[in-house]
């Protein structure tokens, strides 16, 4: 008996739809004051669509408090997604703060510091030595 396999493309399509719908639902339906301006960066689905890791960033407020509030509202968001999505299983939502931007800024800062140090060392090496 052959099993029907879902294509990886379907997984990506559903993740993208969940990302779009969650962005709108969080903005319009969630009234928790701990949730400021939130951007859903990406959604990762398990192959069986049972769980979804939702990565977000926030412009205002504490990321930890926002994550706690979003995870608290995940049941309500799950129910709202169920009404919008036409799939058999709507995944359980798990919200995670996306630190990619902070890590990129820190890495860029380290690179800038290394370049400045190298330029300073090169300038000192090129300077003529003083005779006493």
Swiss-Prot record:
Monomer. Binds 30S ribosomal subunits, but not 50S ribosomal subunits or 70S ribosomes. Coiled coil: none annotated. Keywords: Cytoplasm, Ribosome biogenesis. NCBIfam families: rbfA. It holds the Pfam family RBFA. Disulfide bonds: none annotated. InterPro entries: KH_dom-like_a/b (IPR015946), RbfA (IPR000238), RbfA_dom_sf (IPR023799). GO terms for biological process: maturation of SSU-rRNA. This is Ribosome-binding factor A.
């Amino acid at each position: 008996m052959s099993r029907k396999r879902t294509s990886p493309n379907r997984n990506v399509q559903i993740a993208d739809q969940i990302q779009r719908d969650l962005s709108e639902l969080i903005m319009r339906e969630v009234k928790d004051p701990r949730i400021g301006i939130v951007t859903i960066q990406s959604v990762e689905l398990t192959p069986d669509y049972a769980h979804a890791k939702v990565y977000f960033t926030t412009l205002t407020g504490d990321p930890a408090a926002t994550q706690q509030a979003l995870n608290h509202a995940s049941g309500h968001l799950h129910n709202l997604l169920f009404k919008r999505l036409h799939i058999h299983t709507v995944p359980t939502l798990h919200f995670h703060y996306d630190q990619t931007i902070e890590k990129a800024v820190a890495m860029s800062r380290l690179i800038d510091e290394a370049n400045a140090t190298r330029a300073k060392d090169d300038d000192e090496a090129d300077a003529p030595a003083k005779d006493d």
